[in-house]
């Protein structure tokens, strides 16, 4: 990818290019989701120390997806990547109930960010392949998603591992990009 | 005018004349850019004497001796094998660019963690962490040859100038309306130039701490800039497919180099300020007359984007790096491709010569940096160990130390 390619992806993109920011706590499955989107091997994924960028074609759009590491010490740097974001995807580990409060708090802070104001948000209730996973409806309620009124949002249950539900989420993304970009 | 003393400059080969004129001490250089180990010294010295009035019969012996020393330096066999000396892991996010000071005693690294760190090359010790930017520190530079100041350009739209000695911030330059992605001190270290995604470049007075010129004219992001050796011209390369040549004194646009059919990736003057080389996403590299701004040649051959280009110190050769995974070496005089550097398994984002010009260093997304023989194109060494893409690399002036900066958050020193 190189630094120059990163600069090219940084500039405000033409109509058919979409900048997607993928955030969430560490171990939520962001990188697995990114690789699933790009149809890449997901058997050896390690915690992201920085970021990963991939471009995928979908429904006539070029989706430039930025997957940013979610460990606590690097979360303050998420704002490095806010500029020109078209869609925010927030990933939650649905089986990690102990951290629902933490993830809810991080999401609430993101929704308060001026640079992300009005940006459509898709919440992936990930890891539905695990038996202990909470259903999307429970997460939506726990996170008070119904109180979000300043933007369009959607919660989608998925398994980044199996790929189930991922495409449904991306369809929502493309639909909401098209209304915003046109 | 009275000659006071003669100094050697190894790279590019030259002799510096220190003399007194009107009570003032001045210097000027005799560039010996074509010098080879087998050049006829007697003939060369005669020619120098004819050309340079300060060189009188009494110092011919001294000049001969200096030329011979330069030849010895050029002829030295370098079989140096590099090995990993240290891994520096105090940045907590990916690195951006890296740079040495002139002597190579210190170097700096920029990072997504919003800091620039200053390091001691010999020990690998962190001397200062320059903190204050509110976003990625992308462009960094020492004011070489002095090295007492460091400039940092950030995605936070500001640029800061720091003291190398204390790590204190002298100035914060505000005025750009988008990310600063390239910067350079002028050779006299009186000005700093910054280039931004806001499509402008600016010149800042380092003493007064204020903007002296805004170079407006590009219609898209500026991603490369470079002063010429004398410091009276600056070029800016833009995503608008053009390179602009500006007069530093007046901030006036002198020429626009039009010809590339894709975004510019890199642009540089050669040492004697006669040529400009440009690399582009259109897969080609172009050579231009720096004085008239006219197109001289197109160096084609790469099958994907050219991501970086550079001259060697003497301006005799050009190296190009491409997304096609190869690098190429061209003769700046004949414009012929002399070597293809093949072996990397992914795109090459940076290329540079060692100061002597016999060796080329490339940094790649395949997580390796490689060393190549500049004349034959043979791969001399593969520097392996980084766990992710290498974004930047640099040689020190002596050519015996290399630093590499990676997306894996580490910087490595190789001896």
Swiss-Prot record, chain A:
Gene3D superfamilies with a match to the protein in the record: P-loop containing nucleotide triphosphate hydrolases
Residues annotated to bind GTP: 24-31, 67-71, 126-129
CDD domains in the cross-refs: Arl3 (cd04155)
PROSITE patterns: ARF (PS51417)
Gene Ontology biological-process entries: cilium assembly; Golgi to plasma membrane transport; intraciliary transport; kidney development; mitotic cytokinesis; photoreceptor cell development; protein localization to ciliary membrane; protein transport
Pfam hit, one: Arf
Main location: Golgi
Any one cellular-component term (Gene Ontology): axoneme
Keywords linked to the UniProt accession: Cell cycle, Cell division, Cell projection, Cytoplasm, Cytoskeleton, Golgi apparatus, GTP-binding, Lipoprotein, Membrane, Myristate, Nucleotide-binding, Nucleus, Protein transport, Transport
Lipid positions (N-myristoyl glycine): 2
Topological relation to the membrane, as annotated: Peripheral membrane protein
SUPFAM superfamilies: P-loop containing nucleoside triphosphate hydrolases
Cell compartments where the protein resides: Golgi apparatus membrane; Cytoplasm, Cytoskeleton, Spindle; Nucleus; Cytoplasm, Cytoskeleton, Microtubule organizing center, Centrosome
Molecular function terms from GO: GDP binding; GTP binding; GTPase activity; magnesium ion binding; microtubule binding
Function in brief: Small GTP-binding protein which cycles between an inactive GDP-bound and an active GTP-bound form, and the rate of cycling is regulated by guanine nucleotide exchange factors (GEF) and GTPase-activating proteins (GAP). Required for normal cytokinesis and cilia signaling. Required for targeting proteins to the ciliary membrane by releasing myristoylated protein from unc119 cargo adapters into the cilium.
Family under the similarity heading: Belongs to the small GTPase superfamily. Arf family.
Stated name of the protein: ADP-ribosylation factor-like protein 3
Organism: Taeniopygia guttata
């Amino acid at each position: 990818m190189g630094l120059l390619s990163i600069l090219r992806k940084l500039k405000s993109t033409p109509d058919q290019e979409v900048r997607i920011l993928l955030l969430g706590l560490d171990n939520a499955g962001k990188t697995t989701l990114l690789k699933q989107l790009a149809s890449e091997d997901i058997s050896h994924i390690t915690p992201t120390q920085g970021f990963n960028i991939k471009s995928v074609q979908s429904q006539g759009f070029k989706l430039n997806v930025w997957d940013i590491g979610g460990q606590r010490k690097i979360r303050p740097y998420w704002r490095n990547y806010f500029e020109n974001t078209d869609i925010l995807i927030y990933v939650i580990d649905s089986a990690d109930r102990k951290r629902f409060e933490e993830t809810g708090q991080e999401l609430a802070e993101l929704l308060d960010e001026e640079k992300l104001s009005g940006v459509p948000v898709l919440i992936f209730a990930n890891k539905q392949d695990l038996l202990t996973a909470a259903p999307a409806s429970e997460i939506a309620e726990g996170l008070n998603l119904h109180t979000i009124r300043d933007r369009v949002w959607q919660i989608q249950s998925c398994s980044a591992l199996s790929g189930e539900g991922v495409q449904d989420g991306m369809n929502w993304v493309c639909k909401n990009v098209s209304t915003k970009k046109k | 005018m009275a000659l006071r003393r003669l100094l050697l400059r190894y790279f590019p080969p030259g002799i510096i004349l220190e003399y007194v004129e009107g009570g003032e001490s001045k210097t000027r250089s005799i560039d010996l850019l074509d010098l080879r180990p087998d050049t006829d010294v007697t003939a060369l010295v005669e020619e120098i004497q004819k050309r340079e009035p300060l060189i009188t019969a009494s110092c011919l012996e001294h000049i001969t001796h200096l030329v011979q020393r330069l030849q010895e330096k050029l002829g030295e066999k370098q079989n140096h094998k590099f090995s990993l000396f240290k891994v520096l892991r105090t940045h907590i996010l990916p690195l951006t660019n890296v740079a040495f000071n002139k002597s190579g005693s210190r170097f700096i690294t920029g990072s997504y963690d919003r800091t620039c760190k200053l390091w001691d090359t010999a020990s690998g010790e962190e001397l200062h962490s320059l903190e204050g930017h509110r976003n990625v520190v992308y462009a960094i530079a020492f004011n070489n040859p002095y090295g007492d100041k460091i400039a940092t350009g950030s995605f936070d739209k500001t640029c800061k100038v720091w003291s190398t000695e204390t790590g204190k911030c002298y100035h914060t330059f505000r005025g750009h309306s988008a990310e600063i992605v390239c910067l350079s001190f002028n050779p006299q270290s009186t000005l700093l130039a910054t280039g931004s995604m806001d499509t402008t470049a600016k010149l800042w007075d380092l003493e007064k701490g204020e903007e002296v010129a805004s170079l407006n004219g590009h219609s898209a992001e500026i991603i490369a800039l470079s002063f010429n050796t004398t410091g009276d011209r600056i070029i800016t390369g833009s995503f608008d497919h053009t390179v602009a040549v500006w007069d530093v004194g007046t901030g006036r646009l002198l020429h626009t180099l039009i010809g590339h059919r894709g975004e510019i990736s890199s642009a540089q003057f050669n040492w004697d300020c006669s040529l400009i080389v440009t690399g582009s996403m259109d897969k080609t590299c172009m050579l231009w007359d720096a004085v008239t701004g006219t197109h001289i040649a197109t160096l084609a051959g790469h099958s994907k984007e050219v991501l970086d280009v550079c001259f060697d110190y003497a301006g005799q050769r050009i190296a190009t790096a491409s997304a096609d995974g190869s690098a190429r070496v061209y003769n700046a005089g004949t414009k012929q491709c002399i070597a293809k550097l093949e072996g990397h398994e992914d795109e090459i984002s940076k290329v540079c010569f060692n100061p002597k010009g016999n060796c080329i260093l490339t940094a790649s997304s395949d997580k390796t940096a490689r060393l190549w023989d500049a004349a034959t194109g043979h791969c001399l060494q593969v520097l392996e160990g980084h766990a992710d893409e290498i974004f930047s690399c640099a040689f020190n002036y002596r050519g015996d130390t290399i630093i590499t900066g990676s997306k894996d958050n580490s910087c490595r020193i190789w001896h």
